[in-house]
Amino acid sequence: MTIINGKTKLLGVIGDPIGHTLSPPMHNAAIDALGLNYVYLPLPIAPENLETAIAGLSAIDLEGFSVTIPHKLAIIPLLSQITEKARLVGAVNTVWRTETGWQGTNTDVDGFLAPLKSLDKDWSQVNPVILGNGGAARAVVVACAQLGCGEIHVVGRNQKKLDPFKESWANTSLYDLLEVHSWDELEGLVSTTELLINSTPIGMSPQGEQSPVELELLDLLPPSAIAYDLIYNPRPTKFLRLARTRGIRIIDGLEMLVNQGAIALEIWLGQPVPVSVMREALLKQF
């Protein structure tokens, strides 16, 4: 275990509330395994204090930090630069220090992709169906485009929010790939997709016995399909349990969580990190 001393370098995660975060045990386990003199701390920051806090983090020479709810959008104007990936998603979850100030990116995109990249699929022939059109769905849309998928279908319950969701990409290459649908169109989409993704909070603890779709819809998936849930608690979710009973390959949100964290830690440390150690540390939290 790292012994904190006068030379310990600081990392952290900002959010409000922050008590639920699983990031400190995950990051500190990797830091300990690497034998580095760093520590990763939870930093509770209320929205009204964000601007003052970011200036303070700069003043104390914090090396970098993760950003969670509710600051992923609000922090953008406080940064000197953001990556194109963060601009497309419209949210920042990882920040690091540069000579010109704080720079931000979004590691959720590559975190989501990590378990998919190892699969032997021609992604250009896959037309993903994404359940939900909130902030998490934005990262998934960008990820699916980066993967080289065909049409990307986003299904939401609120029609008034679906059209603005698509129009937010009007001046990007993603616009022509993206189609938005109301929930009653879902049945017609499921039978043609090999990648069904839940980006909604439906099924998250403590409502672990809920699923965004029922077994009858999952029966329509082709045998080669993948069911991917961004939720990591409970493990597995009801959505994934149902998919598994039909022989569908499943991926849960823990893989996205650990991989997005590993990518962030590599940015801060400037070296490879032990992803397996981070995964093991996360599993101990359940």
UniProtKB/Swiss-Prot annotation:
Protein's pathway: Metabolic intermediate biosynthesis; chorismate biosynthesis; chorismate from D-erythrose 4-phosphate and phosphoenolpyruvate: step 4/7
BP GO annotations: amino acid biosynthetic process; aromatic amino acid family biosynthetic process; chorismate biosynthetic process; shikimate metabolic process
Residue numbers annotated as active site: K72
Cysteine disulfide partners in this protein: none
EC numbers for this chain: 1.1.1.25
Reactions this protein catalyses: shikimate + NADP(+) = 3-dehydroshikimate + NADPH + H(+)
Gene3D superfamilies: Leucine Dehydrogenase, chain A, domain 1 (3.40.50.10860), NAD(P)-binding Rossmann-like Domain (3.40.50.720)
Entry keywords, A to Z: Amino-acid biosynthesis, Aromatic amino acid biosynthesis, NADP, Oxidoreductase
InterPro entries: Aminoacid_DH-like_N_sf (IPR046346), NAD(P)-bd_dom_sf (IPR036291), SDH_C (IPR041121), Shikimate_DH (IPR011342), Shikimate_DH-bd_N (IPR013708), Shikimate_DH_fam (IPR022893)
Entry binding sites for NADP(+): E84, G132, N133, G134, G135, A136, L230, G253
Assigned GO CC terms: cytosol
GO molecular function term, any single one: shikimate 3-dehydrogenase (NADP+) activity
Family matches, as SUPFAM superfamilies: Aminoacid dehydrogenase-like, N-terminal domain (SSF53223), NAD(P)-binding Rossmann-fold domains (SSF51735)
Complexes and interactors: Homodimer.
Role according to the record: Involved in the biosynthesis of the chorismate, which leads to the biosynthesis of aromatic amino acids. Catalyzes the reversible NADPH linked reduction of 3-dehydroshikimate (DHSA) to yield shikimate (SA).
Family: Belongs to the shikimate dehydrogenase family.
Name of the protein: Shikimate dehydrogenase (NADP(+))
